[in-house]
């Protein structure tokens, strides 16, 4: 069944343009509430669902939060408001408080004038595709309102921030602390601005916080995981041991060492697999179609299974759950530790990296010295919405030619973004100059 509104990470778009309008978001709240009410009454006759709403720091969050509240209330659903908290905080609190669902108002790493809505189930996982389709179907039903005595109530959740801080700290080994470690934390002027610095500080680190003054208009603006130059500069200026940059909703990260070198999600996954192997057996790990070939080669030599999922943390999660594995990640910095959390969490991922450094007594560079990443070139080409690259004859011919030239010493990946009107062209080869040249050849054929 074709989706009308839900993408790979909920409903997302430009604020004020369909579907991110007050009217649509109110109807979305009502539709989701209607579906949740059906589930809830099936489990416990006469009961009513409660949902938790969290948001990042975008100015439009106030408007969309109010619209969701109205829609849920009209459907007879009670609402708890967490205020600005990371996406993974909503997943955790929904599960911990035994709520029916969690809702996040965020567009992650996108600019401030974008926003989005995504849902978590009662278990703290992203909604199943079937449930999202049910909500889409419910959107086609005219909105009404339950009787006045059945309207949903709305209240604030006391100390959502403190509850989540304690949860994050609980994932760090009891026998370790961060005393003697100087950390720069870039919060992207986003949802973790009042949380991440305190987590690391309470574990003993000396913390320098940047990107922690949200205005409603500056989320991800020259800061955060997608703009690491600010972090690199701050790490060097403060002579820090490590830098950690989160994105706007704090579900992913990048790390920088004392020299200013940036470490990718692929390198972090390699570090974490090796660290886990030092304390327990590791059956396998999950990457994506974009994961560097070097990991595949290294894991094979280590006797560890490796599977590529489609790009998107929800698909990495599905592949892990299917196999009963615990560790997965994307090069963009989405990391999954299923023995720690049900979803990607930038703060918890940082704590796992820090625990590996503490446990080994080594630096990031030392922990990755035995793996040489294949050079990758990724080019994003802006296209019109709905553009189908698979019907572009020139691109397909050039792709086939490049693959023939690479043979077994590289690969080509072309895919459409699930959240933006972009075609991503990636070429991986043992030679960086070759990868760059071939990626540009393919990208040049894109006519839209």
UniProtKB/Swiss-Prot annotation:
Cofactor annotation remark: Binds 1 Mg(2+) ion per subunit.
InterPro entries referenced in this protein's UniProt entry, alphabetically: A-D-PHexomutase_a/b/a-I, A-D-PHexomutase_a/b/a-I/II/III, A-D-PHexomutase_a/b/a-II, A-D-PHexomutase_a/b/a-III, A-D-PHexomutase_C, A-D-PHexomutase_C_sf, A-D-PHexomutase_CS, Alpha-D-phosphohexomutase_SF
CDD domains hit by this protein: GlmM
PROSITE patterns: PGM_PMM
Keywords, comma-separated and alphabetical: Isomerase, Magnesium, Metal-binding, Phosphoprotein
EC number: 5.4.2.10
Active-site annotation: 108 (phosphoserine intermediate)
Cellular component aspect of the GO annotation: cytosol
GO molecular function: magnesium ion binding; phosphoglucosamine mutase activity; phosphomannomutase activity
GO biological process: carbohydrate metabolic process; peptidoglycan biosynthetic process; UDP-N-acetylglucosamine biosynthetic process
Post-translational modification: Activated by phosphorylation.
Superkingdom: Bacteria
Presence of the UniProt keyword Protein transport in the record: no
Cofactor(s) of this protein: Mg(2+)
Catalytic activity, reaction form: alpha-D-glucosamine 1-phosphate = D-glucosamine 6-phosphate
Record-linked SUPFAM superfamilies: Phosphoglucomutase, C-terminal domain, Phosphoglucomutase, first 3 domains
Residues that hold Mg(2+) according to the record: 108, 247, 249, 251
Keyword Isomerase: yes
Record PTM Phosphoserine, positions in chain: 108
Enzyme class: isomerase
One of the Pfam families matching this protein, by short name: PGM_PMM_IV
Role: Catalyzes the conversion of glucosamine-6-phosphate to glucosamine-1-phosphate.
Similarity comment: family membership: Belongs to the phosphohexose mutase family.
Name the UniProt record assigns to this protein: Phosphoglucosamine mutase
Record organism: Herminiimonas arsenicoxydans
């Amino acid at each position: 069944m074709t989706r009308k509104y839900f993408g790979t990470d909920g409903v997302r778009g430009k604020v004020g343009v369909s579907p991110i309008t007050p009217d649509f978001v109110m109807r979305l709240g009502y539709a989701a509430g209607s579906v949740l009410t059906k589930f809830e009454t099936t489990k416990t006759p006469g009961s009513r669902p409660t949902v938790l709403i969290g948001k990042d720091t975008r100015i439009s969050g106030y408007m969309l939060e109010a619209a969701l509240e109205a829609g849920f209330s009209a459907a007879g659903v009670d609402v708890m408001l967490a205020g600005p908290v990371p996406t993974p905080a909503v997943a955790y609190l929904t599960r911990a408080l035994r709520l029916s669902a969690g809702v996040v108002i965020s567009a992650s790493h996108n600019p401030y004038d974008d926003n989005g809505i995504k849902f978590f189930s009662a278990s703290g996982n992203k909604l199943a595709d079937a449930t999202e389709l049910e909500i889409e179907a419910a959107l086609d039903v005219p909105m009404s309102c339950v009787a006045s005595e059945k309207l949903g109530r709305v209240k604030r959740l006391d100390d959502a921030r403190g509850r989540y801080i304690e949860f994050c700290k609980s994932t760090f080994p009891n026998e370790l602390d961060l005393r003697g470690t100087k950390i720069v934390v870039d919060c992207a002027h986003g949802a973790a601005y009042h949380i991440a610095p305190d987590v690391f500080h309470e574990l003993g680190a000396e913390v320098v916080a940047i990107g922690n003054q949200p205005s409603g208009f500056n989320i991800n603006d020259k800061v955060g995981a997608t703009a690491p130059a600010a972090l690199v500069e701050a790490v060097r200026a403060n002579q820090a041991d490590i830098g950690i940059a989160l994105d706007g909703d704090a579900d992913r990260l990048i790390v920088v060492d004392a020299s200013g070198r940036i470490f990718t999600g692929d390198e972090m996954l390699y570090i974490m697999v090796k660290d886990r192997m030092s304390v327990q057996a590791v059956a396998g790990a999950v990457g994506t179609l974009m994961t560097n070939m070097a990991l595949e080669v290294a894991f094979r030599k280590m006797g560890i299974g490796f599977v590529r999922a489609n790009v998107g943390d929800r698909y990495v999660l599905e592949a892990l759950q299917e196999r009963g594995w615990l560790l997965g990640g994307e090069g963009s910095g989405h990391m999954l530790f299923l023995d720690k959390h049900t979803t990607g969490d930038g703060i918890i991922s940082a704590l796992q990296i820090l625990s590996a450094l503490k446990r080994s007594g080594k630096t990031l560079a030392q922990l990755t010295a035995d793996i040489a990443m294949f050079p990758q070139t990724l080019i994003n080409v802006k296209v019109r919405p709905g553009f189908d690259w698979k019907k572009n004859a020139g691109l397909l011919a050039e792709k086939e030619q490049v693959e023939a030239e690479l043979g077994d010493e590289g690969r080509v990946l072309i895919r459409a973004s699930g959240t933006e009107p972009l075609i991503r062209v990636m070429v991986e080869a043992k030679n960086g100059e070759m990868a760059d040249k071939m990626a540009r050849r393919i990208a040049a054929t894109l006519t839209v």
